[in-house]
Amino acid sequence: MGGNKKESYKKTSLGSKAKGPEKPSCSSARKHQSEPMSKSPIASTSAAAANVTPAKTFAHAVATGSNPGQVTAGVEKLTRKHGVRCLMSSTHGIEAYIKAAAEVVGHSAVVAASKMYGKAIIFARTLTAVHTLVQRGITVGGSYVPVEPLEGLGTRVVLSNVPPFLQDHLLYPHLQALGELKSNMSRIPLGCKESRLRHVLSFKRQVQLLLPRGQDTIEGSFGVPFEGVLYKIFYSTEEVRCFLCKNLGHTRQSCPKGQIKTTAPVPAPSASNKTSYPAGTISAGSSKGISPSLKNLKVAVTQPTSTTSKPPPSSLKTSKAAACLTIAAKEKGGKHVKASPRVTVVPITKKCTPVMGTPEGVGVPMIATSVGVGADSGLSSSDAKKKRKFKSNWLVPEEWASVVNDGAPPSKGKKGSKTSAPHVVTLSGPTVGHDQPVSDHALLPPDQVGNNEVNGLHGLEHGSVGFPTESGVQYLPQNHLEDLPLECKETPNETPAEWAVSVPEVLRFGNCNQPQFLVPQGISLQEGENIGLTPIQDPADKTAGKDGEGGVVDTEEGSQTTSTVHAKISLPLSSTDPNVIAIQKAQEVVERAEANHRASKALPVAGELISSVAPVSNTSKCVSSEVEGTPEPLQGLQKSDSDTFPATTCGEILKALVERGDYQSLSQEELMDEGNIEEEVDIGVANPSTPIIPAEELKKFLESTLGVKLEKKMHMALEKWHDLPLVINSVRQYIKVIKEAKNYGTAEYLRIMKFHKKCLSHQTLMKVKALPKTQ
């Protein structure tokens, strides 16, 4: 038993961690004493080393073999994806960055780190820790330090001026247009030094983008519409930029050019300065009546600055608006002042196709807006700051005179300064009640400016007809009773050919009991353009409407000289800002969806069919223009709730076509009953007894409804529809899609065509809700 206890004791002592060095035995001591003197230094060194506890380092752990696996656990599985990097400052070492990373992901998650080329390279144990570091960043010395991944680095893009309530998914489409997203978007803290305020975020966010080849840096801005307000977001890959000197690396507060030089030399006294006196000291000891404590006081006297000396650099900093006004004044006083553009009068006639032209010059004019201050603006700097309180670049009442008159009124900052005359459209001809130019009735607030209902831009703030502004929206002041003449005039010769746009001849007038005025449809618009005609529903039209409601004057054939039609016209002036063009595409969809009268005015219905639709009348006949190929008026249609034109739904058109006999007999319940239309219809389940619409007639109906020519592939697909036994279900589903798509732009109807093409190829119908709602 005793031997076993000693043996177990030895094993326990050997297996346990020694707290200190073991004492040498007597035999070992005698062995050291018997060694020669030449080895005594080595022996003493080894003995001293034996008495010192070795440092607990990774090398010592590996050399002694004391559990090295615990230190190297997870190192073998590391890849480049586990590494992150960040910039290092000269005041902090690598350990400070390791501690900062450990505070974010935990001390055990940090595996390796090093300083390379002025950057801290840190490897984390898991990819989750890497993503956390990239999204949150680290804080070193009270300053926020962004962290980038090593794998697929891309370029760090910083977004500024981003309100905290804007969600990230609203920014991703704009960022994807710049490059490939390599990381999620993260919010950048404000960097408060107070520990209780470190959670406060700034208006900046960061994201990793893989830019196109050959592009290292990007800088610009884009607009994000949100709840009726357009927010301008700035993005940049460079360092912080000074707005004073436009250089990188510092802000305006620390700009060298903005610092006041306090060590400037004192100028010599001026001969004309009577208050000059020699520099020296004034002693208070010789003065009477002065306290003894002040007798030894000496006041330093310096030469005062002459009145003709230059002010300090800080007083020389003038606003950009003042500088622009000075330049504008010089340009006005010089000989190189551009002449005002000529005004183009655009007529409308019933006998010919009206043509819209533009004033002389193709370039988009620059007009004074609520944010425009400079050579092209009549606003002073103080006025501009007040106008910037508006959420958009709309003209305010004081600025209407700058748009409609020959020049802008004198600005408050500079007497006599005027802006160049903008493009003004004068609607001439016989008038109702007055004969005054449009400018006399143009000084109206923006909320009273009419919309261009032709193009469906119903909700674009205050209006969308006429002039382009910095926001890309074109509008004219409301002309209360100004009328367009019903006589034929040619377009001015100076109008460029590429700017002339022919309006489809669906503008009709009739002497029916109920008012009838068909808005021109199918006008092809380029990106950013806004052109068309819009009827003005004015109470002065006594012959239209009920109880004094607005309408359009009914005109008989041959009465063009006495009666006029109220209408507004817009010029094809396009916006050149790519951001505006991109925003308009999405904004039109949103605004149409929010419009109250979207069901009748936003849908480009079938031009040939709708133009021939007339209200039921037993006492009068509708007078239509002489258009080749126009079908006979359809009977049996009731006037819809819209005041613009009747028969706005495709279902009513199909119903009228069935009653007229163009299609085979289809019951009204099968055609119009939406309750039986399912979200998904399987074409494979067919009813052979269902009547089939001829493919050629269906093709014409689709082409006329959409107002566009179908592709050849689509023609071929439609020709095969007669082989499908369930054509009627497809037509019913198509009607539902059209009804759902009333709020979309013209490009959305091309999506509907692709939608049907996909239905034919896969022999199934997609859900209506799956149709994209943004362009």
UniProtKB/Swiss-Prot annotation:
Keywords: Transposable element. Residues 1-10, 539-549 have a biased composition (Basic and acidic residues). The keyword Acetylation does not apply. Residues 35-46 have a biased composition (Polar residues). Residues 1-46, 256-277, 535-565 are annotated as: Disordered. Signal peptide: none annotated. This is Transposon TX1 uncharacterized 82 kDa protein.
